[in-house]
From Swiss-Prot:
Keywords: Aminoacyl-tRNA synthetase, ATP-binding, Cytoplasm, Ligase, Nucleotide-binding, Protein biosynthesis. Pathway: Aminoacyl-tRNA biosynthesis; selenocysteinyl-tRNA(Sec) biosynthesis; L-seryl-tRNA(Sec) from L-serine and tRNA(Sec): step 1/1. One of its GO terms (molecular function) is ATP binding. It comes from Stenotrophomonas maltophilia (strain R551-3). One of its GO terms (cellular component) is cytoplasm. ATP binds at residues 264-266, 351-354. CDD domains: SerRS_core. The lineage of its organism: Bacteria, Pseudomonadati, Pseudomonadota, Gammaproteobacteria, Lysobacterales. Its main location: cytoplasm. This is Serine--tRNA ligase. Disulfide bonds: none annotated. L-serine binds at residues 233-235, 287, 387.
Length: 426
């Protein structure tokens, strides 16, 4: 969440910045009314608490002298109900203000381009050259059907739409991709491999901002009195490792990676990408998370994005790097780079990685802090997350970019050690 001082002292300025950069309408009058009530009731609550404390002290002193305390106790009883009601009212007002705060998106960095949607994103660079085919290009669905690799029909019988059963060599290729990415990020990029729970509590999702705003896109389980959510990304458990922690400065930047299943309801997908594996309810991803000092987060963001780029380059997959505009960034982000891989069947680039610097937005929700050695005091850390990369989409890109005229797939050299030396499948 944003710094509460912005809401208290600069609500009109904040509202204008949110409107112009995020298209978000902040109800300033409602916020100012709640804040005025909070201040008034907080002052009265503090007065009553001070009075209670002073009278309690007086009771103790009177008892020590053997004096009658009935009059003082009657005085305390007279304002006890008001104090209790005042404390309850203050808590309710704070909850209402917090609810507003939790629904406000992060403010973009100054160098993020203004824009309404993906059409206003700014391309930063391209790598690789799209292959020119001398035969009819098939998409991943057609290639999967020809080889008996992708079975959506059986998956629909088992689970419904937006699921796929992978069979034989393509299942092995999918596994090889994940292993390759984890080995690369741990062996060459300095990330610590981390195995995380797939079920998390609501506090974890509030910490990384999926709750309360995006609850409709989450799968929720309930057993008895226990409610858990399937993770939409391992960003959630990885980042929450430092929730309510004070990290020693010498441990920063803290870099973690996890290969995990991810689960999304795709409530807002609007029927997009219903064919094939581009947009699934269940998919795998290798996630990168960094916890850094505030002054280092820009450089860490560039580094993280570069780590994701290296994955695509080692696989020989053409891609482009895009700086997202204000209207296309995620809720928590200060700044985001997307990597989009070339898909020959669509003759376009599709997102395969998104790398975001969230500043102190998530850290404030989580109370994730580091101890500044210059002051000896704890301060909010900065959190960053990125896909390094989406495994299913990488598999699709390999299938399409490395396809042959007979429907077989050439295995990229980087994956051959993970495929028992196989050079082609199919």
């Amino acid at each position: 969440m944003l710094d509460p001082a912005l809401l208290r002292h600069q609500p009109a300025d904040l509202a204008e910045r949110l409107r112009t950069s995020r298209g978000f309408e902040l109800d300033v009058s409602a916020l100012e009314s709640l804040e005025a009530d909070r201040k008034r009731i907080q002052v009265r609550t503090q007065e009553l608490q001070s009075l209670r404390n002073s009278r309690s002290k007086a009771i103790g002193q009177a008892k020590a002298k053997g004096e009658d305390v009935s009059a003082i106790m009657a005085e305390v009883a007279a304002f006890a109900d008001e104090l209790k009601a005042s404390e309850v009212a203050l808590d309710e007002l704070r909850e209402k203000i917090d609810a507003i705060s939790m629904g406000i998106p992060n403010l973009p960095a100054d160098d993020v381009p203004a824009g309404a949607d993906e059409n206003d994103n700014v391309e930063q660079a391209r790598w690789g050259t799209a292959r020119q085919f001398d035969f009819k290009v098939l998409d991943h669905v057609e290639l999967g059907a020809r080889n008996g690799w992708l079975d959506g029909e059986t998956a629909a019988k088992l689970s419904g739409s937006r699921f796929t059963v992978l069979r034989g060599p393509i299942a092995r290729l999918h596994r090889a991709l994940a292993q390759f990415m984890v080995d690369l990020h741990t062996g060459e990029h300095g990330y610590e491999e981390t195995n995380v729970p797939l079920l998390v509590n609501a506090d974890s999702l509030r910490g990384t901002s999926q709750l309360p705003k995006f609850e409709d896109d989450l799968f929720k389980t309930a057993v008895g009195d226990s409610t858990r959510y399937l993770i939409p990304t391992s960003e959630v458990p990885l980042t929450n490792i430092v929730r309510d922690e004070i990290v020693d400065a010498e441990r920063l930047p803290l870099r973690m990676t996890a290969h995990s299943m991810c689960f999304r309801a795709e409530a807002g997908s609007g029927g997009r990408d219903v064919r094939g594996m581009i947009r699934q309810h269940q998919f795998e991803k290798v996630e990168l998370v960094s916890i850094s000092r505030p002054e280092d987060s820009d450089a860490e963001h560039q580094r993280m994005t570069r780590c994701a780029e290296v994955v695509l380059e080692k696989l020989g997959l053409p891609y482009r790097k895009v700086l997202l505009c204000t209207g296309d960034m995620g809720f928590s982000a200060v700044k985001t780079y997307d990597l989009e891989v070339w898909l020959p069947s669509q003759e376009t680039y599709r997102e395969i990685s998104s790398c975001s610097n969230c500043g102190d937005f998530q850290a404030r929700r989580m109370q994730a802090r580091w101890r500044n050695p210059a002051t000896g005091k704890p301060e909010l850390a900065h959190t960053l997350n990125g896909s390094g990369v989406a495994v299913g989409r990488a598999m699709i890109a390999v299938m399409e970019n490395y396809q042959n005229a007979d429907g077989s797939i050439t295995v990229p050299e980087a994956l051959r050690p993970y495929m028992g030396g196989l050079e082609t499948i199919g």
